[in-house]
A protein has these predicted regions:
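Active-site helix of classical SDR
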Residues: 36, 71
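SDR active-site lid
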Residues: 87-153
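A short helix-coil junction within the Rossmann-fold of NAD(P)-dependent oxidoreductases
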Residues: 38-47
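Active-site-adjacent segment of SDR/Rossmann-fold oxidoreductases
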Residues: 60, 81-91
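Conserved mid-core segment of classical short-chain dehydrogenase/reductases
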Residues: 7-22, 64
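Hydrophobic structural elements of the Rossmann-like NAD(P)H-binding subdomain
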Residues: 1, 51, 92-95
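Residue(s) in the substrate-gating loop at a strand-loop-helix junction
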Residues: 55
Length: 182
């Protein structure tokens, strides 16, 4: 299970320490690549399963999260490639999450200076899912060997909405993130 992650909350034009891109990519993408690389022979030998706990931001960009979204896009592309290359010997599952209560991901997110922002941005909690409910759904999906798991389930519409209702989707996401900034 690939579950490493560090987030950010800063507009790209407000970033004062560009090294936060390297830091986020090193954890979110390269850390997962390193884990898969170290275990690939064993996974192939035992018809193993790779499960990536990721985010809806792997499917599209998101305001205030340029480095985070980019790192999750990279991970998504890497795992999709593995599925094509090794699909007969290993299984790859992606779990796309929305906001989850109780993870401290937001408190540990990096701000424009590359430092943790702390508890200053938690307005999304009314939209967030309980961590126990989330883990139950993840386990159920893994047991069923699902290739894609969306939590909450409405996230499954993102690829469709991005393709056919792009402007509407971008306006909706911009509205949600601007509410958090105020």
């Amino acid at each position: 299970i690939l579950n490493a992650g560090i987030s950010m909350w800063a507009r790209f034009d407000n970033i004062t320490d560009i090294s936060l891109f390297h830091k986020i990519n090193e954890i979110n993408y390269q850390g997962s690549v390193n884990c898969v690389y170290a275990s690939i022979d064993e996974l192939k030998k035992n018809n193993g399963q790779i499960v990536a706990i990721t985010t809806a931001q792997a499917l599209m960009g998101f305001p205030n999260a340029s480095a985070y979204s980019a790192s999750k896009h990279a991970l998504h592309g890497f795992l999709e490639t593995l599925q094509m290359e090794l699909g007969s010997t290993i299984s790859v599952s992606n779990v796309y999450l929305g906001w989850i209560k109780g993870t401290n991901l937001r408190a540990n997110a990096l701000g424009p200076n590359g430092e943790k922002i702390g508890d200053s941005h938690h307005k999304h909690s009314s939209r967030a899912i309980d961590i126990d409910s989330c883990t139950t759904k993840i386990v159920q999906g893994i047991e069923k060997n699902k290739k894609t798991i969306y939590i909450p389930s409405f996230l499954r519409f993102i690829p469709f909405a991005k393709l056919f209702f792009r402007k509407w989707l971008f306006r909706k996401i911009n509205k949600v993130t601007s509410e958090e900034e105020s």
